[in-house]
């Protein structure tokens, strides 16, 4: 079974093409027009062992909001499409990741019920040109369009770059765990028989 997807999204604000291979090796080719997001998506894919190719062009002359949110939408849709009927997956993933002084956790349930809990209290600030509140916008769009419960918790940390990096790494690792195939799972991991 090949678990891949290619998604294109074209709006008046963004043009995005994304290809995902869930069963990859963490290889990436990413160009979003938002350098800090490129860095975070590289980390997400590398630590989740997903192959990810992304080309995006957005109205970044205004700000990065539309591009970041729309990439979250497209990445979520790609996972949803690649997972298809979710047969044989673990469904759940939970990881805690350190990044120097920072510790962050991500918990995933590929349930078909989108919900984000984002306990990452950050000041209104920037990392380079990137508004840190856009990380939450990205994860909200990703959770909604992937159809997952996603809980991200910052246990502690000071450096904004490290905090966001730990969150992306943790989500990548948790998604890897949740999407992993388990030969013991017959059908889907649900007493309802559907996810």
Swiss-Prot record:
EC number(s) per entry: 4.2.1.19
Gene3D superfamilies, per the entry: Imidazole glycerol phosphate dehydratase, domain 1 (3.30.230.40)
Entry-linked CDD domains: IGPD
MF terms (GO), sorted A to Z: imidazoleglycerol-phosphate dehydratase activity
Keywords (A to Z) from UniProt: Amino-acid biosynthesis, Cytoplasm, Histidine biosynthesis, Lyase
Annotated signal peptide: none
Catalytic function, reaction form: D-erythro-1-(imidazol-4-yl)glycerol 3-phosphate = 3-(imidazol-4-yl)-2-oxopropyl phosphate + H2O
Pathway per the UniProt entry: Amino-acid biosynthesis; L-histidine biosynthesis; L-histidine from 5-phospho-alpha-D-ribose 1-diphosphate: step 6/9
Main location: cytoplasm
Recorded GO CC terms: cytoplasm
Alphabetical GO biological process terms: L-histidine biosynthetic process
Enzyme type, top EC level: lyase
Location in or out of the cell: Cytoplasm
Family: Belongs to the imidazoleglycerol-phosphate dehydratase family.
PANTHER family reported in the protein's UniProt record: IMIDAZOLEGLYCEROL-PHOSPHATE DEHYDRATASE (PTHR23133:SF2), IMIDAZOLEGLYCEROL-PHOSPHATE DEHYDRATASE HIS7 (PTHR23133)
Name of the molecule in the record: Imidazoleglycerol-phosphate dehydratase
Lineage: Bacteria, Pseudomonadati, Thermodesulfobacteriota, Desulfuromonadia, Desulfuromonadales
């Amino acid at each position: 079974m090949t678990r891949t997807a290619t998604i294109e999204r074209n709006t008046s604000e963004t043009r995005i093409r994304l290809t995902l291979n869930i069963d990859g090796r963490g290889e990436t080719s990413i160009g979003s027009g938002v350098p800090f997001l490129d860095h975070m998506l590289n980390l997400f894919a590398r630590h989740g062992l997903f192959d990810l190719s992304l080309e995006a062009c957005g109205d970044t002359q205004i700000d990065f909001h539309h591009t970041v949110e729309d990439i979250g939408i497209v990445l979520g849709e790609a996972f949803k499409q690649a997972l298809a009927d979710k047969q044989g997956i673990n469904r759940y993933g939970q990881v805690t990741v350190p990044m120097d002084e920072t510790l962050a956790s991500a918990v995933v349930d590929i349930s078909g019920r989108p919900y984000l809990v984002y306990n990452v209290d950050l000041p209104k600030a920037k990392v380079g040109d990137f508004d840190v509140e856009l990380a939450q916008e990205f994860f909200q769009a990703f959770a909604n369009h992937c159809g997952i419960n996603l809980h991200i918790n910052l246990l502690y940390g000071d450096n904004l770059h490290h905090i966001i990096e730990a969150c992306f790494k943790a989500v990548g690792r948790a998604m890897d765990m949740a999407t992993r195939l388990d030969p013991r799972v017959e059908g889907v991991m649900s007493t309802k028989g559907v996810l």
